[in-house]
Design a protein with these regions (language model features):
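Alpha-helical segment proximal to the catalytic Tyr-Lys
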Residues: 114, 158-162
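C-terminal substrate-recognition "lid" of short-chain dehydrogenase/reductases
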Residues: 199-226, 231
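Active-site helix of classical SDR
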Residues: 109, 145, 153
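Residue(s) in the substrate-gating loop at a strand-loop-helix junction
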Residues: 129
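Conserved glycine-rich Rossmann-like NAD(P)H-binding loop of the short-chain dehydrogenase/reductase
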Residues: 24-40
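Substrate-binding pocket helix/loop in short-chain dehydrogenase/reductase
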Residues: 85-86, 93-98, 180, 187, ...
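Catalytic Tyr-X3-Lys loop
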Residues: 80, 87-106, 121, 125, ...
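Conserved glycine-rich cofactor-binding loop
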Residues: 10-11
């Protein structure tokens, strides 16, 4: 039985990944920051173990991974966004996005790596975004952090590959999650119309891609776009 750790697992893509891996018989732990009610609901539904942890807090992350023990798969899904002009983003907001979206991955990789190196085996899947590939107006900070995730993914794949550890990323497009709740309906409709498939994605779409990368033995350093063709590279 494989042990999977998923960050940001109380809702959206993270919760869908928890359900998918648990449904396939994995031993699942998920981290969440503050949505206790949602975390309890996901844990009850799936039998997964929930740990309250801000991934930007290095010490808290280490405590969480100490509780987990040895992990076979790490899914770095936790993330925050900010919508607004670059001139409107405060330094504190900018730093918070990097602390969660980039430093959070660094903290989790550092915490899980000793176990994976000892076993000479492991899989890491990072959740980026199509905006990390092409950028988005009024989402400069978010796009920048997600671009950093892609660069980190490729660098780690080269660094850790000789140790039997694969590192890949998914780059979701417009997915119907709480992160999109504040987006005006007409904007969402416009995005749907720009998507070649004529649909918006679901958390389950992204979770399926995550599960594939976690289990693909000859795939590393790759970015799997899950965007309905919105961005084709």
């Amino acid at each position: 039985m494989k042990t999977v750790v998923i960050t940001g697992g109380s809702r959206g893509i993270g919760a869908a990944a928890v359900r998918l891996f648990a449904g396939r018989g994995a031993r699942v732990w998920f981290l969440y920051e503050k949505n206790h009610e949602a975390a309890r609901a996901v844990a009850r539904e799936t039998g997964a173990q929930a740990l309250c942890c801000d991934v930007a807090d290095e010490a808290a992350v280490q405590r969480a991974f100490d509780a987990v023990g040895s992990a076979d798969i790490l899914v770095n899904n936790a993330g925050v966004c900010h919508y607004g002009l670059i001139s409107q983003i405060t330094p504190a907001e900018w730093r918070r996005l990097f602390a969660v979206n980039v430093d959070g991955i660094y903290n989790c990789v550092r915490a899980v790596l000793p176990q994976m190196l000892q076993k000479q085996s492991g899989a890491i899947v990072n959740v980026s975004s199509m905006w990390g590939q092409v950028g988005a107006s009024c989402e400069a900070a978010y796009s920048t952090t997600k671009g950093a995730v892609l660069a980190l993914t490729k660098a780690l794949a080269q660094e850790l590959g000789p140790s039997g550890i694969r590192v890949n990323a998914v780059a979701p497009g417009v997915i119907r999650t709480d992160m999109c709740a504040s987006v005006a309906p007409e904007v969402m409709e416009g995005l749907r119309q720009q998507t070649p498939t004529g649909t918006l994605g679901t958390p389950e779409d992204a979770a399926q891609a995550i599960a594939y990368l976690a289990d693909a033995p000859f795939v590393t350093g790759q970015v799997l776009a899950v965007n309905g063709g919105f961005v084709i590279t």
